[in-house]
């Protein structure tokens, strides 16, 4: 394993450490707003100062909100169990790979609730300051890709319903005219390019029975074979819950 490769003394042989990495992955279905003002620009200039003042002095305003105005957990297969989570917000996501838009927009974050793909977390070097390597393997399992396809298609149907459609302009993503059928390679490429972590990495010290070579802890987070050591975060979940991982 990583310890032997890096010349680190092994106190306990636990091959499950770092395995079973998974996350909630999704994509941001985004459209321009038309004729109404969203939240874009509220974090800059005078708007930012006004919002800060309202919160500091009165505990009200935008900073007193999560900015996620609505959400839904939806069964896209008819199985009786929700498999896609939606979160709605009146602004467009931005980041290193997604520059700010010129206009107002709204986003429907579309997230897989039961991730099947599994990756691995590893050591970069023997120096703990160097951080770790992460092989996410996002959408590696075809069931995850199929779920996100269904979720994105349903999100677009939501956008096309009245009265929401009356305040929307052009689609940003998925782009207008995209073939979103199951067999569309273009749709698959778009989803793979846009898929992102929703911030719920889980599972790399999963709990289980002591005779299970892939388990790391027991049900109370006690590490097998290392007295006095516990794991107390979401890494001990064998599978991520079908919700934000801070919920339990």
Q: What annotation goes with each model-predicted range?
A:
Residues 33-38, 51-248:
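FAD-dependent oxidoreductase catalytic-site/capping-region signature
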Residues 1-52, 62:
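Glycine-rich loop(s) and the adjacent beta-strand/alpha-helix scaffold that form part
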């Amino acid at each position: 394993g990583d310890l032997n490769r890096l010349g680190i003394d092994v106190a306990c042989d636990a091959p499950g450490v770092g395995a079973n990495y998974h996350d909630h992955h999704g994509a941001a279905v985004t459209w321009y707003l038309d004729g109404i003002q969203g939240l874009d620009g509220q974090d800059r200039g005078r708007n930012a100062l006004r919002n800060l003042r309202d919160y500091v002095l009165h505990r009200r305003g935008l900073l007193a909100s999560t900015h996620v105005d609505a959400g839904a957990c939806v069964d896209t297969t008819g199985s009786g169990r929700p498999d896609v989570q939606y979160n709605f917000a009146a602004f467009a996501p931005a980041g290193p790979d997604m520059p700010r838009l010129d206009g107002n927009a709204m986003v429907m974050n579309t997230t897989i609730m039961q991730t099947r793909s599994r990756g691995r977390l590893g050591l970069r070097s023997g120096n703990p300051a160097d951080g770790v390597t992460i092989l996410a393997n996002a959408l590696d399992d075809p069931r995850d890709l199929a779920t996100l396809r269904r979720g994105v298609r349903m999100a677009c149907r939501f956008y096309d319903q009245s009265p929401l459609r009356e305040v929307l302009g052009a689609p940003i993503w998925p782009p207008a005219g995209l073939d979103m059928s199951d067999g569309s390679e273009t749709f698959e490429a778009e989803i793979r390019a846009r898929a992102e972590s929703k911030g719920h990495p889980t599972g790399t010290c999963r709990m289980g029975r002591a005779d299970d070579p892939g388990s790391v802890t027991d049900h109370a987070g006690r590490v097998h074979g290392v007295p006095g050591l516990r794991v107390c975060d979401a890494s001990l979940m064998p599978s991520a819950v079908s919700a934000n991982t801070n919920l339990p």
